[in-house]
């Protein structure tokens, strides 16, 4: 049996606890802190069997002015447990002088050492402890506290902190030197708080201490309830009374397995977490990385990925890998239309927003004893993004995780093919398939469903298969962040205030990107309409208009927008499952019918429910090129073909009564021949780099993508494999690559 990397030591401790609170003096004699504490413990000992944390301490951490002391007292009263303020009850009693006097006496650096030493000589259990603002800057003392405590970070808006400190007439903070502002020091301190916390309480501006205390208790309950956030298959049938309950999966298991054993896709068993209006407003001034951490912490239980580790992953994923510091900026195009630029990552497509993070999540979740092979079907952008993302893992992880990207040999642009092939590394390979994307995607699903083959790989090679397409929850979840972030950027740029509705228009093939926008709405972003834009392969447009998903006599057309040249939209199943109130039986019937009869029809009530939120239309090839041309001539902005598809559809169906955010899913550099044709540039048989330099001479927006330009300069021709459109042939390639990598 596999043991997944989940922190089960977080389970609730319910046994009776008696606080033992003491400080070691210089003579190592133990003395009780105060008579008050001892009496409080005697008075409350009867209540301790019902303690929220048992013997563990609740440790409140945050900057000066966060309200740790006040909130700690409220929690102590609610739980009937001892309350310890490190400033008043530890430091001043140890030093026999005030904290300010000690700081004045020894200076900043020595103060931190003296403070840390005092905390190291202190122990307690079953108590609420309010730290000083500088405690987290001393590693040894924080490890000492963390051993028997749950550290809760009170994350208070910066302006609130500054206002409170003025009211408190605080004129100096530990570590503040002449010339350093309080604002700069508080920003500097954040790195230490992020390092230590187990749970974060994201405090709204103006929140009362009582509200914050309730949030702390809820955060601790969530932290300890390791079994509360699980995932089910979209084809999961809820058991009737008396029937055995099927076991759900944890986040880490859903990420590792990718596809459910019954052929369905993993979705949360409960509703998406929702942020309050005040919490969203507090994120308006945050960076993309800060927004990502807040949102993903709400969606990933700390037993699956501890908050501090998740923060490290996010900073690695969205650090120097992106050409724009805003990661996914929003640019005003014209009128009520805005462009969400999702192409600043290393491979120039929106896939980077997921696939720079997902490999780190995957590597954290897998057990150390097995090797893993990620199978990917790509219609253009996913392949290079997956190969690039997994190539950035550390050496140890790359030795146990490999990637195989299958792409239609003649179904992607020349640049995309060169990019996929050029992204091969020591743990990643590209395989061209003599068929279309739908065959590649269906073949991978069949490989996953073949228990004999997957079992053979596990037994013979100690290798397990998984996926990195948007069927994998770990791949889909990070996409929620940029849709939420786009809305917050419109607020920060002064175009809207929180609560104002927006529409989104997204070029759609596999339904993952637009589904992520649906999840952003569930978290509290007021998206009014989801506009689904298709190219000539408009099966989704037809479905949204009629409720009939029909693949009969429908052939895949190759277009200027190959990443949405898709007929089987995998993530549609997740949305139908959501609309149908998690009816797994219905999903099983519909998608089995699609597999056997190549079509299905949903009932009228579901069609009407779908059309309440969704609008759909499609764009011809001529309209796509015309949109690229007209947009450049009117605004100096070059759209890639996928974004042009969305622009055409948006112009046709949007009523202009609210702002419209168009997802720009790729950089135009990847489609230079189509762009040159659209801009009526004389066709020249030149290299890709020459074409990009020519486009660069137009000084258009956005500027050339430097990473893509560097890719075109690489003259070496990397080898890759090509195989026939046969599932068994794909299996043999997978086995051979496993032998080469792991044996």
Curated annotation (Swiss-Prot):
GO terms for cellular component: cytoplasm. The modification N6-(pyridoxal phosphate)lysine is found at residue 351. The modification N6-acetyllysine is found at residue 281. The keyword ATP-binding does not apply. Its cofactor is pyridoxal 5'-phosphate. Pfam families: SKI (PF01202), Thr_synth_N (PF14821). Coiled coil: none annotated. Keywords: Acetylation, Pyridoxal phosphate. NCBIfam families: thrC (TIGR00260). Belongs to the threonine synthase family. This is Threonine synthase-like 1.
């Amino acid at each position: 049996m596999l043991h997944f990397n989940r922190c089960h030591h977080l389970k609730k401790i319910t046994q009776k606890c008696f606080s033992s609170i003491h400080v070691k003096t210089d003579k190592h004699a133990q003395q009780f802190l105060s008579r008050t504490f001892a009496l409080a413990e005697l008075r409350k000992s009867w209540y301790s069997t019902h303690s929220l944390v048992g013997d563990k301490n609740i440790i409140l951490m945050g900057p000066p002015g966060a309200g740790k002391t006040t909130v700690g007292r409220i929690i102590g009263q609610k739980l009937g447990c001892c309350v310890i303020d490190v400033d008043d009850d530890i430091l001043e009693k140890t030093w026999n002088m005030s904290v300010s006097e000690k700081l004045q006496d020894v200076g900043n650096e020595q103060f931190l050492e003296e403070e840390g030493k005092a905390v190291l000589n202190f122990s307690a259990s079953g108590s609420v402890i309010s730290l000083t603002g500088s405690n987290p800057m001393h590693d040894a003392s924080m490890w000492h506290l963390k051993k028997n405590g749950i550290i809760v970070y009170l994350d208070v808006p910066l302006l609130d902190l500054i206002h409170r400190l003025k009211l408190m007439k605080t004129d100096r903070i530990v570590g503040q030197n002449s010339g350093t502002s309080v604002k700069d020091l508080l920003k500097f301190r954040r790195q230490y708080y992020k390092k230590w916390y187990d749970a974060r309480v994201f405090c709204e501006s103006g929140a009362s201490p009582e509200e914050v205390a309730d949030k702390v208790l809820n955060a601790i309950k969530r932290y300890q309830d390791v079994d509360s956030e699980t995932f089910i298959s979209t084809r999961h049938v809820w058991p009737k009374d008396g029937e055995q309950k099927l076991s759900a999966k944890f986040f880490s298991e859903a990420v590792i397995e990718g596809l459910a054993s019954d052929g369905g896709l993993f979705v949360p068993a409960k509703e998406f977490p929702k942020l309050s209006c005040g919490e969203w407003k507090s994120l308006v001034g945050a960076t993309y990385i800060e927004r990502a951490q807040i949102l993903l912490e709400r969606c990933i239980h700390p037993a699956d990925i501890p908050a501090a580790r998740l923060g490290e992953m996010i900073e690695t994923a969205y650090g120097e890998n992106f050409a724009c510091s805003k990661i996914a900026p929003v640019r005003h195009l014209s009128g009520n239309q805005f462009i969400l630029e999702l192409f600043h990552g290393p491979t120039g497509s929106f896939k980077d927003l997921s696939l720079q993070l997902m490999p780190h999540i995957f590597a954290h979740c897998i057990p150390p004893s097995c090797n893993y092979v990620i199978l990917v079907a790509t219609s253009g952008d996913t392949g290079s993004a997956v190969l690039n993302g997994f190539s950035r893992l550390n050496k140890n992880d790359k030795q146990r995780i490999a990637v195989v990207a299958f792409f239609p040999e003649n179904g992607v642009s020349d640049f995309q093919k060169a990019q996929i092939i050029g992204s091969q590394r020591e743990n990643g390979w590209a395989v061209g398939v003599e068929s279309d994307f739908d065959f590649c995607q269906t073949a991978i699903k069949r490989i996953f469903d073949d228990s004999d083959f997957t079992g053979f790989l596990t037994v013979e090679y100690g290798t397990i298969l998984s996926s990195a397409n948007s069927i994998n929850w770990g791949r889909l979840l990070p996409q929620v962040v940029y849709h939420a972030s786009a809305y917050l950027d419109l607020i920060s740029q002064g175009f809207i205030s929180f609560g104002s509705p927006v529409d989104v228009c997204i070029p759609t093939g596999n339904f993952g990107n637009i589904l992520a926008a649906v999840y952003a709405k569930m978290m509290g972003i007021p998206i009014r309409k989801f506009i689904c834009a298709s190219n000539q392969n408009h099966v989704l447009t037809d479905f949204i208009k009629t409720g009939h998903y029909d693949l009969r006599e429908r052939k895949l057309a190759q277009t200027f927008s190959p990443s949405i040249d898709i007929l089987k939209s995998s993530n549609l199943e997740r949305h139908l499952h959501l609309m149908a109130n998690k009816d797994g039986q219905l999903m099983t019937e519909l998608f089995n019918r699609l597999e056997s009869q190549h079509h299905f029809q949903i009932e009228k009530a579901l069609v009407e429910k779908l059309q309440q939120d969704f609008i759909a239309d499609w764009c011809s090839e001529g309209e796509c090129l015309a949109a690229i041309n007209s947009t450049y001539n009117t605004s100096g902005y070059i759209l890639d073909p996928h974004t042009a598809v969305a622009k055409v559809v948006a112009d046709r169906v949007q009523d202009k009564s609210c702002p419209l955010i168009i997802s720009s899913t790729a950089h135009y550099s990847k489609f230079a021949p189509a762009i040159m044709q659209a801009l009526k540039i004389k066709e020249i048989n030149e290299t890709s780099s020459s074409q990009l330099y020519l486009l660069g001479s137009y000084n258009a927006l956005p500027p050339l993508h430097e990473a893509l330009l560097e890719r075109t300069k690489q003259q070496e021709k990397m080898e890759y494999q090509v195989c026939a459109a046969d599932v068994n042939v794909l299996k043999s390639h997978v086995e051979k690559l496993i032998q080469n990598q792991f044996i």
